[in-house]
């Protein structure tokens, strides 16, 4: 009887070990082969520019600046195209950060405002210490943390 219990315990332990290995490989696979677009985003209500004072409306983000991390000091001039951020070679801002995913986040313009959205990254994207779960408006000067890299929008 004791031999049977010992054998069942060994088999159960091996099954748990293989289940753990399978889940780790599945997570790595989804991070490596993450979709390039087509991310479902719930849109919230945005504050319209007409409600802001005139002096705040004049400040339009024109540059993306890396303030912390390996690429500190890097500046990207913003246009009308979204900025893809991640470790992929075809990203607009290619990060050499171990905590960043291949396709980590996207900064998208909507009128004169910029929104950040996480593209299903493993470690998440943070705006002012708050985790980004949907497309969120990025105020000028607010830190956006992607792994060890921090970026800001500047006028």
From Swiss-Prot:
UniProt keyword Hydrolase present: no
Modifications after synthesis and translation: Phosphorylated by PknB. Dephosphorylated by PstP.
Highest taxon listed in the record's lineage: Bacteria
Alphabetical keyword list: Cell membrane, Membrane, Phosphoprotein, Transmembrane, Transmembrane helix
GO cellular component, one term: plasma membrane
Signal peptide per UniProt: none
Domain annotation FHA: ranges: 83-132
Membrane topology designation: Single-pass membrane protein
Bilayer-crossing regions: 6-28
InterPro entries: Cell_Proc_Reg/RNA_Proc (IPR050923), FHA_dom (IPR000253), SMAD_FHA_dom_sf (IPR008984)
Phosphoprotein listed as a keyword: yes
Pfam family for this entry, one: FHA
Positions where Phosphothreonine occurs in the chain: 36
Annotated localization: Cell membrane
Name of the protein in its database record: FHA domain-containing protein FhaB
Gene source species: Mycolicibacterium smegmatis (strain ATCC 700084 / mc(2)155)
Gene behind this protein: fhaB
């Amino acid at each position: 009887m004791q031999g049977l219990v010992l054998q069942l315990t060994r088999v159960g332990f091996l099954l748990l070990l293989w289940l753990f290995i399978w889940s780790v490989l599945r997570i790595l696979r989804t991070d490596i082969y993450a979709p390039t677009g087509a991310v479902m985003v719930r849109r919230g209500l945005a504050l319209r520019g007409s409600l802001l004072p005139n002096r705040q409306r004049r400040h339009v983000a024109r540059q993306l600046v890396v303030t912390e991390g390996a690429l500190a000091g890097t500046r990207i001039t913003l246009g009308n195209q979204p900025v893809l951020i991640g470790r992929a070679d075809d990203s607009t801002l290619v990060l050499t950060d171990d905590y960043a995913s291949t396709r980590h986040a996207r900064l998208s313009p909507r009128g004169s405002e910029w929104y950040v959205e996480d593209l299903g990254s493993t470690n998440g994207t943070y705006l002012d210490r708050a985790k980004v779960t949907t497309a969120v408006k990025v105020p000028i000067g607010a830190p956006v943390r992607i792994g060890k890299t921090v970026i800001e929008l500047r006028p």
